């Protein structure tokens, strides 16, 4: 039995109906769970002797509003965690979708893996995903006065405001963005024998 098959069987046995979907692609397993089961599943993944995912390596937010070749018809925001079992030497990706696209809220994993602290803060800062139960959920990389969440696909590339140092006021000031959007149309120039190809 292959290593992924052993992990898949252990996940199905330990989690039962909590497994919403289990996807195998490129030699990795992705476990999809519902937000209501997320915290309980995380504890089982850590504590069950047949699984023993001792480490959370990473957690990131994802905006699926424009995913793949067309419009995404599922829930918009997800948190994706990368887990590692040192005991069994295997990895697992866990994906959970926030049930509300307008105000995405998911349970915090801080009580399961305390190393998730800054990862959840980053997902909050960039995507606006609120992690319920997080002890210090505030921006981590953008400025305190930053408006919006810059990794959302509907966030304008130029942003809303720009900041600069004003020598007259001797301080940093914020002002509306002065960049005018423009359309750039690429041109393709074809030359005979370009690159030595006929």
Swiss-Prot record:
Belongs to the complex I 30 kDa subunit family. This is NADH-quinone oxidoreductase subunit C. HAMAP family: NDH1_NuoC (MF_01357). The gene is nuoC. It is a peripheral membrane protein. The keyword Cell membrane applies. Its EC number is 7.1.1.-. PANTHER family: NADH DEHYDROGENASE [UBIQUINONE] IRON-SULFUR PROTEIN 3, MITOCHONDRIAL (PTHR10884:SF14), NADH DEHYDROGENASE UBIQUINONE IRON-SULFUR PROTEIN 3 (PTHR10884). Gene3D superfamilies: NADH:ubiquinone oxidoreductase, 30kDa subunit (3.30.460.80). InterPro entries: NADH_DH_suC, NADH_quin_OxRdtase_su_C/D-like, NADH_UbQ_OxRdtase_30kDa_su, NADH_UbQ_OxRdtase_CS. NDH-1 is composed of 14 different subunits. Subunits NuoB, C, D, E, F, and G constitute the peripheral sector of the complex. NDH-1 shuttles electrons from NADH, via FMN and iron-sulfur (Fe-S) centers, to quinones in the respiratory chain. The immediate electron acceptor for the enzyme in this species is believed to be ubiquinone. Couples the redox reaction to proton translocation (for every two electrons transferred, four hydrogen ions are translocated across the cytoplasmic membrane), and thus conserves the redox energy in a proton gradient. It comes from the Bacteria. Transmembrane segments: none annotated. It is found in: Cell inner membrane. Its main location: membrane. The keyword NAD applies.
